[in-house]
Structure formats: C-alpha cells, structure tokens
Amino acid sequence: MQYKIKIRDSTTPELLDSFFEHAWTYRKPVKFVIDVTECKRVSLGRILSMKGVLDKHRPNSRRYIDHSEVIVRSRWARRLLSIGLGIIRTERPVYISTPT
C-alpha cells in the first residue's frame, strides 16, 4: 500500500504524528511517499524537530514500513535531508528524489 503525505511549511510534528497514526490503522505493509516540494523553509533544525515523532513510531515503522520515498525540490534540500536522516537513523530505507 502506498501512503502519500504532503509536507508544507505549516506542518507541525503533531500533524506528522497524526499522519503516521492514520497509516498504522490499516495494519498493512506501507510505502510512504512524502512530498516536501512545497516547503520553502528547509533547515536541519526543522528536520531534526521531527525526530521525536519518528522515535515514537519506531515499533510500527519496523513492522509496517517497507521503505519510504521523500520528494524534495532541490539538490540542496536533498543533501540537507540526507544529513538529517543520518543523524535521526531511520528504521527502514529512505530514498530521496527530486521531481523530474
């Protein structure tokens, strides 16, 4: 099952938490497709602010996520996200792409 999430500058950790909670209700393997192309304020601090949410959902991530794809708008955002994910240490593979 593919679960799409659109992240904007206004997305809070609480909203991201609700997206994950909803995805787990299906109790099926899932591939997250996270679109962050509308974010204009990308920073390492903002990426790391989501760590608490990801830590909370680690048990379900191990159980249900096959892999995730994050779509970013620039090579700079791709590099920054790659650094942030290295610090966070995700449970499953995360592939980062730019729109073509």
Name each model-derived stretch.
Residues 1-100:
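Amphipathic, Lys/Arg-enriched alpha-helical "gate/interface" segment within cytosolic domains
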